[in-house]
Amino acid sequence: MKALVKREASKGIWLEQVPVPTPGPNEVLIKLEKTAICGTDLHIYLWDEWSQRTITPGLTIGHEFVGRVAELGSAVTGYQVGQRVSAEGHIVCGHCRNCRGGRPHLCPNTVGIGVNVNGAFAEYMVMPASNLWPIPDQIPSELAAFFDPYGNAAHCALEFDVIGEDVLITGAGPIGIIAAGICKHIGARNVVVTDVNDFRLKLAADLGATRVVNVSKTSLKDVMADLHMEGFDVGLEMSGNPRAFNDMLDCMYHGGKIAMLGIMPRGAGCDWDKIIFKGLTVQGIYGRKMYETWYKMTQLVLSGFPLQKVLTHQLSIDEFQKGFDLMEEGKAGKVVLSWN
């Protein structure tokens, strides 16, 4: 079967022929229909410092997908061949304190598909049946293909109460853009998004952001003054940029709450005085709550949340290089690849 493989320890990704996997007793074989390129996939493509210490060459990458059940393991019940599914890309152990305590998203033994084990950029893949998420008929496959990052955005946006609150989002990648839309959809007062990429800031505005700020041209403090704000009640850090995070700390209202998804460089510092003397709460976010986040993000789309506005490109798998080029240049929202 075709698969996108990180063949070499250098920049690039390669379309290769690999064996079709065989599902174990509690697994399901999935025939992929559509997959989406994530920022993590771009890191692996670029072979940056994180990838070099994390990825073993020879890996089939990818973790954002939708497909149909092609074969059931001998012990699997509750699913049918031909059923359309996505899946939680974090495979957890099931026996640690957090898994047994109902907090599997905090499992210290988590294995990520497309990072630690072979992933979804292939014609077929296997997943534990317990990780599957059925996709309702009303949701098109091109949107279901990126439920994984949509779930990251939903986890962040729903971590704290944002109804009637002023929200600052640093980083207008697809996850930040979607999070901005969710915050407005559920009743935030002002949602301000910062970045230096005007293309992606426009997508955030299209999804409902009150103001988008190119911080290379405009002062965030000036925008706050225009909105008659003393500070932000909730911050969502999506950029992984230490300067953006410190700007957020500077602009938070006393007692504010911050959800952090962006991965900071090793050794990055911050102004601890702002966190301490403002009484800020900082919560790390990893993945999605299993499976409450999946339920809520599904219902958001079914209730009219315009997730389609962040989808900018649909390509065939043979055009994968164009997709990675668009992501590298910052000229895309979500890029979806078709395997049909």
From Swiss-Prot:
The keyword Nucleus does not apply. The keyword DNA repair does not apply. It is found in: Cytoplasm. It is an enzyme of class 1 (oxidoreductase). Keywords: Cytoplasm, Metal-binding, NAD, Oxidoreductase, Zinc. Its EC number is 1.1.1.103. Its cofactor is Zn(2+). Catalyzes the NAD(+)-dependent oxidation of L-threonine to 2-amino-3-ketobutyrate. NCBIfam families: PRK05396.1, tdh. This is L-threonine 3-dehydrogenase. It comes from Xanthomonas campestris pv. campestris (strain ATCC 33913 / DSM 3586 / NCPPB 528 / LMG 568 / P 25). The lineage of its organism: Bacteria, Pseudomonadati, Pseudomonadota, Gammaproteobacteria, Lysobacterales.
